[in-house]
């Protein structure tokens, strides 16, 4: 538990230090330079009192948050994070544009998205950690309808990352396998967009791990430690007006960049807006996004008319139920409507339109008049912006360029003119996400190939007699550094278990082998039968690609990575696993060790708690284990209690 608390402390404390040294618009109004935009005196009075409204309990009237606004409706590949920033962190919020730019420069050092076609999953039984290639899995951050998100750490750079695990096909395909192809299309689309979109307010993709033999795709993303944007607490808002305004500005910048690149998100909502350590909001989840590089036409309109996303954030043109009137044309204005609903949620802690039934909700979105609560008071500028964002007619709805120029959006900025100039998306080059890039975003796996892979993966290896001169395949759970002096020699889990099970088949053969390896033990009781020893290692840590091993075991959130200690004693090589650092690993000494090459694996188990109290020539033996009496290991609290030995041929 101590390591967990220390780890969380190291993650939180630097954030506070950064925020303390940044500019706060709430207290630095006197430093705001004059701007070309008109001032609204009424808003300065609102701003002075806006930060304290969170302490009050404002009634939401007769409105309730309907289940339709939750995560379960329609949204695919949703980030569902468990960590939420506490209210004590909200007061440290500030104008974070400069800090976001510094972090953005660090993310740009990643370069192009790395594509890996080979995946190696490992589970370390000694430390309880799981590894996907060189990423250490720490814990689960959350899961949605079609995927899950893990917190990982790069074992090389020690950087925290988010690993999104997405199945290539639906687990429960429905009529005509339509869902399977739909899921593939969502995964392809999200990967293709994340590969090309590079913006400070869009979640950055670092690596795509896509093994053709795997049924899942692993997306390595930047870690958003703040989780989802908080917006409601028992139908009451949790953000001040200035905080909601800053979050809103970040979303506007990210959404403007996406529209400039010809990408319509189609699922803008607070659950898909994530916070990083500097409280910068970034847009995530592009599973239902639409790519329209060539402009919008009739085919685009038909595709955009499909109701994907979250119903509570649907635009009126998506909810059209009147057959007597023509439906308005569908365009990127649906994202502007969802942006307005999101701003309403951030300000008032609830959705503008709610109903118990989906059809009733659609009718309200199309026909019901927008009702803006009087508390908290967002001023005339805020009301004007909400009305223009939530305009029923998409032709009359405000555009994102107009949103950026709106006085309510610019209020509180140090230099609005410079902000508009630096955030212009036309200063960056356009990216094109072609149909071929979407189609080739992931590798396809045939059903026959998957079945054959599972068949060979679960088949136990045939028993064979080990030759002392032959090398043994390495166990996936044993990770050791490469050595230039010796070849990589190891022992697989199933082979180790089979080797011990074969010792109980033939008693005479067992006695002969015991005489060669453990003559002292034979002198005590040569007729004593040892029970059949099965370590339970003859199964894989990850049974198959459809079920992760993390569902069956808990996480150990220690900071250290399992290390390997190796010593050479005569003709034996000893490997020991420990969760300590390399400098703390006790050395193994075995002077005068005389081992005979039997070609049989030997497992030595020592009870080091009582090791010092025992005579030097006494070696405790656990029934079912074959131990080596001549192996002297260093005692003490730092000495590992487990080691694996096997014969090998040293290389000169």
Swiss-Prot record:
Residues 508-518 have a biased composition (Basic and acidic residues). Its main location: cytoplasm. It comes from the Eukaryota. The modification Phosphoserine is found at residue 59. It is an enzyme of class 2 (transferase). Keywords: ATP-binding, Cytoplasm, Kinase, Nucleotide-binding, Phosphoprotein, Serine/threonine-protein kinase, Transferase. Residues 467-491, 506-529 are annotated as: Disordered. One of its GO terms (biological process) is negative regulation of TORC1 signaling. It catalyses: L-seryl-[protein] + ATP = O-phospho-L-seryl-[protein] + ADP + H(+); L-threonyl-[protein] + ATP = O-phospho-L-threonyl-[protein] + ADP + H(+). One of its GO terms (molecular function) is protein serine/threonine kinase activity. The active site is at 267 (proton acceptor). Its EC number is 2.7.11.1. The keyword Cytoplasm applies. One of its GO terms (cellular component) is cytosol. The keyword Transmembrane helix does not apply. Residues 135-409 form the Protein kinase domain. It is found in: Cytoplasm. The modification Phosphotyrosine is found at residues 58, 63. ATP binds at residues 141-149, 164. PANTHER family: MAP/MICROTUBULE AFFINITY-REGULATING KINASE, SERINE THREONINE PROTEIN KINASE. Involved in actin localization and thus in polarized cell growth. Belongs to the protein kinase superfamily. Ser/Thr protein kinase family. This is Serine/threonine-protein kinase ssp1.
């Amino acid at each position: 538990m101590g390591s967990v608390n220390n780890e969380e402390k190291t993650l939180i404390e630097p954030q506070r230090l950064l925020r303390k040294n940044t500019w706060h618009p709430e207290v630095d109004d006197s430093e705001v330079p004059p701007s070309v935009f008109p001032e609204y005196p009424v808003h300065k009075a609102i701003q002075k009192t806006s930060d304290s409204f969170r302490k009050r309990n404002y009634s939401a009237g007769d409105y309730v948050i309907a289940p339709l606004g939750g995560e379960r409706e329609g949204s695919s590949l949703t980030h569902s994070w468990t960590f939420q920033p506490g209210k004590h962190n909200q007061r440290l919020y500030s104008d974070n544009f400069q800090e976001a730019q510094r972090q953005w420069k660090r993310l740009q050092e990643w370069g192009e998205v790395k594509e890996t076609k080979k995946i190696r999953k490992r589970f370390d039984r000694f430390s309880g950690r799981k590894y996907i290639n060189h990423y250490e899995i720490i814990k689960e951050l959350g899961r949605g309808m079609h995927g899950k998100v893990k917190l990982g750490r790069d074992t090389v750079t020690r950087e925290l990352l988010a690993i999104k695990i997405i199945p290539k096909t639906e687990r429960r395909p429905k009529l005509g396998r339509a869902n399977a192809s739909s899921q593939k299309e969502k995964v392809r689309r999200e990967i293709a967009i994340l590969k090309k979109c590079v913006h400070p307010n869009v979640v950055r993709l670092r690596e795509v791990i896509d093994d053709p033999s795997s049924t899942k795709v692993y997306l390595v993303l930047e870690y958003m430690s703040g989780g989802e944007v908080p917006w409601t607490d028992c139908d009451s808002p949790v953000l001040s007006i200035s905080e909601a305004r800053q979050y809103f500005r970040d979303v506007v910048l990210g959404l403007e960049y996406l529209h400039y690149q010809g990408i319509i998100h189609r699922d803008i909502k607070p659950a898909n807006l994530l916070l990083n350590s500097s409280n910068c909001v970034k847009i995530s989840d592009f599973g239902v996004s639409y790519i329209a590089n060539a402009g919008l036409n009739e085919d685009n309109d038909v595709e955009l008319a499909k109701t994907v996303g979250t119903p509570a954030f649907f635009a009126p043109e998506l909810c059209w139920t009147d057959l007597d009137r023509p439906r308005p044309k569908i365009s990127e204005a649906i994202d502007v409507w969802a942006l307005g609903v999101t701003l309403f949620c951030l300000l008032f802690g609830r959705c503008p339109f709610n109903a118990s039934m989906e059809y009733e909700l659609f009718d309200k979105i199309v026909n019901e008049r927008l009702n803006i609560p009087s508390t908290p008071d967002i001023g005339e500028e805020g009301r004007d912006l909400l009305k223009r964002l939530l305009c029923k007619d998409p032709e009359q709805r405000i555009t994102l360029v107009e949103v950026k120029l709106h006085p309510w959006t610019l209020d509180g900025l140090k230099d609005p003119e410079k902000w508009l100039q630096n955030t212009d998306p036309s200063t960056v080059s356009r990216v094109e996400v072609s149909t071929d890039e979407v189609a080739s975003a992931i590798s396809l796996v045939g059903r026959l190939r998957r079945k054959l892979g599972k068949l060979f993966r679960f088949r136990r290896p045939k028993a064979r007699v080990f030759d002392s001169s032959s090398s043994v395949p390495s166990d996936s759970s044993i990770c050791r550094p490469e050595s230039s002096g010796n070849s990589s020699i190891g022992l697989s889990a199933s082979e180790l278990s089979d080797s011990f099970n074969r010792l109980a088949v033939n008693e005479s053969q067992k006695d002969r082998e015991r005489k060669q390896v453990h003559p002292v033990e034979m002198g005590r009781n040569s007729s004593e039968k040892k029970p059949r020893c099965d370590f339970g290692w003859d199964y894989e840590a990850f049974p198959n690609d459809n079920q992760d091993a993390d569902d069956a075991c808990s996480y150990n959130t220690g900071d250290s990575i399992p290390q390997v200690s190796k010593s050479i004693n005569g003709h034996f090589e000893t490997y020991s696993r420990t969760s300590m650092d390399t400098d703390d690993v006790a050395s193994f000494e075995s002077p005068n060790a005389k081992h005979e090459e039997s070609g049989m694996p030997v497992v030595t188990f020592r009870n080091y708690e009582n090791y010092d109290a025992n005579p030097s020539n006494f070696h405790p033996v656990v029934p079912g284990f074959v131990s080596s009496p001549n192996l002297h290991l260093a005692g003490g609290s730092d000495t590992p209690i487990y080691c694996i030995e096997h014969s090998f041929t040293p290389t000169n």
